């Protein structure tokens, strides 16, 4: 990751104070660069981020075009973004003390603008002093990572591809991503994590409905998603349906329709997505509270793992070619 520009503004709507940075952050300083890289990397790879699209009349998009075309500087654009966000948060009665980090980076040849609005916490630092004994000073602390309450956006400057990380909140009787809709003037699609949950729920429901083996169907879906994320390729819902429901062809269109009705696009981007550990394994629950956790790829390799159904309807599980066994 190459950090081109970075500025930090204070948006204290609780105390009605806006402090815009007068100088950029010292990105060449080793500790500052390391802190920024950790935080910006987490923003790029957040599993809960949602793909968004700007409305045609978006004021933010208009200013963004001016910045990309170099008619305004990073400092000026950064200050405008801070002032605009402060005004929107005040208008929505979002009274909180936050730091708004704005950075332009180059990652894998792509130039991105990243904004992270994050609540900061107060802390006390002790400085030993020979004359005054121990002196306590109040400081503010920003965490290294991205928190659930943060508002984050990532914009690829070449084509204005937008990703947003924001928890929904109630506004005028509706659950919405408030700052994305008001500040960016953009709409958002479900996140990769939400998409995965929807597809797994629909897949499980339809497997049970058509008397298919759920133990085989869900791991297949998880494996396809895992491979797509590792390759950073799109997930086509129709292709997933084709693989899952080979035995029940008429279920393919129903699966695609149910997923579409849940608000999921026909093709799902996996750009910058990272898999949680739980998405790399499959848990099997059996009688007598037996739980088996296996790597996903094992379920498609009969030489390593097999489920055998007996004539009386019971199952046997074989884990094969094990060279080492430990109690954990």
Regions found by a protein language model. Give the residues of each.
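C-terminal structured domains
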Residues: 242-328
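Long, hydrophobic alpha/beta structural blocks
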Residues: 1-279
């Amino acid at each position: 990751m190459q950090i081109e520009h970075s500025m930090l503004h204070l948006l204290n709507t609780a105390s009605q104070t806006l402090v815009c940075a007068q100088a950029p952050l010292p990105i060449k300083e080793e500790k500052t660069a390391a802190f920024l890289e950790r935080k910006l990397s987490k923003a790029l790879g957040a599993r809960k981020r949602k793909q968004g699209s700007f409305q045609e009349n978006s004021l933010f998009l208009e200013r963004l075009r001016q910045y990309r075309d170099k008619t305004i500087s990073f400092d000026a654009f950064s200050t405008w973004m801070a002032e605009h966000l402060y005004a929107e948060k005040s208008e929505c009665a979002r009274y909180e003390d936050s730091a708004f980090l704005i950075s332009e980076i180059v990652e894998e040849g792509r130039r991105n603008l990243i904004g992270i609005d994050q609540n900061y916490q107060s802390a006390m630092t002790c400085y030993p002093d020979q004359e005054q004994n121990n002196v306590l000073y109040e400081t503010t602390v920003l965490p290294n990572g991205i928190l659930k309450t943060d508002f984050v956006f990532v914009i690829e400057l070449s084509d204005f591809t937008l990703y947003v990380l924001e928890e929904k909140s109630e506004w005028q009787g509706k659950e919405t991503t408030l700052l994305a809709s008001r500040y960016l003037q953009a709409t958002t699609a479900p996140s990769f994590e939400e998409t995965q949950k929807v597809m797994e729920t629909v897949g499980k429901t339809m497997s049970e409905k058509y008397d298919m083996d759920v133990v085989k169907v869900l791991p297949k879906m998880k494996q396809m998603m895992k491979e797509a994320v590792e390759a950073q390729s799109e997930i086509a819902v129709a292709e997933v349906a084709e693989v899952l429901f080979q035995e029940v062809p008429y279920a393919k269109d129903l699966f695609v329709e149910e997923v579409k009705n849940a608000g999921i696009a026909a093709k799902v981007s996996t750009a910058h997505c990272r898999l949680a550990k739980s998405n790399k394994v499959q848990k099997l629950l059996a009688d007598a509270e037996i739980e088996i956790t296996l790597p996903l790829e094992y379920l498609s390799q009969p030489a390593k793992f097999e489920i055998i159904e007996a004539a009386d309807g019971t199952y046997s599980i074989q884990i094969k070619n094990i060279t080492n066994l430990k109690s954990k």
